[in-house]
Structures are given as structure tokens and as C-alpha cells.
């Protein structure tokens, strides 16, 4: 196997090892090559990644090698993290979000009754995107969690307050909340 292929494989190993990284000994074992050769290849790859036209670098922490983003690009990564988008949400999550937006505070069971399917995964996604949060507990058996939208929800969808959501007219009350919400989002984003 030539040097180019070895680098390619090591690059893949670094990628799949993720944040945990990979020991050079593991690379040597996988590629069936000597440790000094692994170290030489890693050093070459580190130098190649130092160029200004590369977004990743290979770093060593506690004897483990892994990919990391470059510090000088941190402000761009932060912008991405700070702006969750509706495009990254599944259809189920968007439908659930619309229900929460119009019916908050609302329990998971109430959402499932409206949607007709389980909402566990959609709720986890919305909470992790900081678009909804726990607002307290409902009275009654089991004291279920009540969910509502967050400031991040308003920011993400360009709303100042929940009053900026399109009103549910008598005609629209028959319409699925999700359909109405998606329509309103298209209007807001124009």
C-alpha cells in the first residue's frame, strides 16, 4: 500500500474515531505498519493541514490523535451553533413545534392526541434545539410536564412575541395547526 493510501486510511480513522481520538498504536495495528512510520505519516498530515486552505487540523491530546477545527475559524462555528434553523428539523418536529406554539402550555399526551402519533423523538429534538422547554407540570394524575416555546423559538422564526403568530380564524381552526404554521413561516421568511 502506498503512502497516499495510508494517509487516506488514517484520515478516515481519525474521522470515525471522533472526539475520542485514536492512539498511534491502533493505527499501526490497523494498517499493519511500524509505529515510527505511523508517527512520520501523522506528522506529514499535521503539516499538510496547517495550510490556510484547510478547515481541520490534526491535534494530539493525551497520546491520542484526532481532528479539530481551527481556532481562527471559531467565530464562524459559533454563528452556526447560535442559529438553529427550521431546515434542520424533521417534518414530525415541525408539526410538533406548531402544535406547541399554538396550544402552549401543552403536555406530551395532548400533542400526541392532536398528531395521532408518538412525539417523544420530536420533543427531544425540539428541546435540544432550544426551541421548546419545560414550563412546569399539569395538575392531575402523574402531573405531566407542560411544554412551551422559548425565546430562541421567537428568534429563529423572526417573531417578536407569540402574538406575532398568525391568528387562528374560525375557518383556520378547522385546519391542521401545522399547516397553518408552515404557511405563516413562509410568509414571515419572504
Curated annotation (Swiss-Prot):
A Pfam family annotated for this UniProt entry: SMC_ScpB
Keywords: Cell cycle, Cell division, Chromosome partition, Cytoplasm
Location of the protein in the cell: Cytoplasm
Family annotation (SUPFAM superfamilies): Winged helix' DNA-binding domain (SSF46785)
Major location category of this protein: cytoplasm
Keyword Cell cycle applies: yes
Example GO BP: cell division
GO cellular component: cytoplasm
Domain of life, per lineage: Bacteria
Similarity comment: family membership: Belongs to the ScpB family.
Function: Participates in chromosomal partition during cell division. May act via the formation of a condensin-like complex containing Smc and ScpA that pull DNA away from mid-cell into both cell halves.
Listed PANTHER family: SEGREGATION AND CONDENSATION PROTEIN B
Subunit structure: Homodimer. Homodimerization may be required to stabilize the binding of ScpA to the Smc head domains. Component of a cohesin-like complex composed of ScpA, ScpB and the Smc homodimer, in which ScpA and ScpB bind to the head domain of Smc. The presence of the three proteins is required for the association of the complex with DNA.
Entry-linked HAMAP family: ScpB
Protein name according to UniProt: Segregation and condensation protein B
Amino acid at each position: 500500500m502506498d503512502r497516499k493510501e495510508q494517509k487516506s486510511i488514517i484520515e478516515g480513522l481519525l474521522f470515525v474515531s471522533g472526539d475520542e481520538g485514536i492512539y498511534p498504536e491502533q493505527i499501526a495495528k490497523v494498517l499493519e505498519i511500524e509505529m515510527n512510520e505511523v508517527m512520520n505519516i501523522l506528522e506529514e498530515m499535521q503539516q499538510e493541514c496547517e495550510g490556510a486552505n484547510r478547515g481541520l487540523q490534526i491535534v494530539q491530546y493525551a497520546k491520542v490523535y484526532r481532528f479539530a477545527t481551527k481556532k481562527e475559524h471559531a467565530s464562524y462555528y459559533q454563528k452556526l451553533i447560535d442559529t438553529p434553523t427550521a431546515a434542520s428539523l424533521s417534518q414530525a418536529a415541525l408539526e410538533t413545534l406548531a402544535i406547541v406554539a399554538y396550544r402552549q402550555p401543552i403536555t406530551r399526551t395532548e400533542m400526541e392526541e392532536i398528531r395521532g402519533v408518538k412525539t417523544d423523538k420530536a420533543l427531544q429534538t425540539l428541546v435540544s434545539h432550544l426551541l421548546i422547554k419545560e414550563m412546569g407540570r399539569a395538575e392531575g394524575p402523574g402531573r405531566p410536564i407542560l411544554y412551551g416555546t422559548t425565546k430562541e423559538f421567537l428568534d429563529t422564526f423572526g417573531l417578536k412575541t407569540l402574538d406575532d403568530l398568525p391568528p387562528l380564524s374560525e375557518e383556520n381552526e378547522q385546519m391542521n395547526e401545522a399547516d397553518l404554521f408552515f404557511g405563516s413561516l413562509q410568509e414571515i421568511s419572504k
